[in-house]
């Protein structure tokens, strides 16, 4: 993934999950990227923009701003989660996932599940896809849309081990503990209920999506 500065003339609210990465920044809108920039990594910049020559760990690789109280975020304190979410909204990719429209398939899917089944599904996905210390698909194990859990993982920086490392201070080379998994499940649930306040404890019946007179249910016709 190239480190890229999004052009100033691009409306931040027109960006979608399909065209942003955790290595992208839009500093003119105060939306940054805190991903550590490897040496000699290719960077795509605007013509009038110069990246900072040396990145302080935890600062934006593009403009050098250091906004986040990282020890506070790394405490993983759910009673202080509003601060964590506010700071995540200063990073471009997280901002997009907190504000983008959720696709209808994902909406229908989670309404059918309800909170109780969603909680179970979130834990199951974390254990299968990101709990292990090594994954040959590291960085690509979480799709960008189609399920509210995917949106939540990107929004709360638990979609891959690299994001977990710099946002939550969990080294890549260790197995996630049960308390860590439980913390991420709670972040996912908080995201889901914030984005979909109509979500009920138990699932509800939702009509299948119609497209040109044909019924689409979970991608099947």
Language model features: what each stretch is:
Residues 6-15, 40-53, 139-151:
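Short, intrinsically disordered, charge-biased short linear motifs at domain edges
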Residues 15-23, 52-59, 153-156:
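Short metal-coordination and nucleic-acid-contact micro-motifs, chiefly zinc-binding Cys/His arrays
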Residues 26, 31, 64-67:
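Cys/His-rich microdomains that often coordinate metals
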Residues 69-70, 166:
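Short, non-ligating residues that shape and space the ligands of small metal-coordination modules
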Residues 75-86, 175-179:
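Short cysteine/histidine-rich metal-coordination sites, predominantly Zn2+-binding motifs
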Residues 133-175:
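Amphipathic protein-protein interaction modules
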Residues 178-214:
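Long, highly charged low-complexity segments enriched in Glu/Asp and Lys/Arg with interspersed Ser/Thr
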């Amino acid at each position: 993934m190239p480190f890229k500065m999004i052009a100033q003339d691009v409306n931040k609210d027109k960006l979608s999950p399909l065209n942003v990465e955790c290595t992208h920044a839009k500093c003119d809108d105060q939306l940054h990227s805190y991903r550590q920039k490897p040496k000699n990594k290719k960077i795509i910049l605007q013509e009038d923009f110069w990246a900072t020559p040396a990145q302080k760990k935890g600062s934006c690789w593009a403009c050098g701003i250091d906004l986040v109280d990282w020890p506070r975020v790394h405490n993983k304190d759910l009673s202080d989660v509003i601060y964590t979410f506010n700071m995540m909204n200063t990073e471009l990719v997280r901002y997009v996932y907190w504000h983008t429209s959720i696709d209808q398939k994902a909406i229908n899917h989670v309404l059918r599940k309800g909170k109780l089944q969603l909680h179970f599904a979130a834990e199951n996905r974390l254990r299968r896809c990101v709990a292990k210390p090594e994954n040959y698909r590291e960085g690509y194990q979480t799709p960008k849309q189609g399920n509210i859990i995917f949106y939540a993982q990107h929004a709360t920086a638990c979609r891959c081990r690299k994001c977990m490392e710099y946002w939550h201070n969990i080294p890549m080379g260790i197995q996630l503990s049960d308390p860590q998994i439980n913390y991420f499940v709670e972040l996912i649930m908080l995201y889901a209920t914030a984005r979909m306040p109509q979500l009920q404890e138990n699932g509800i019946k939702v009509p299948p999506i119609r497209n040109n007179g044909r019924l689409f249910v979970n991608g099947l016709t």
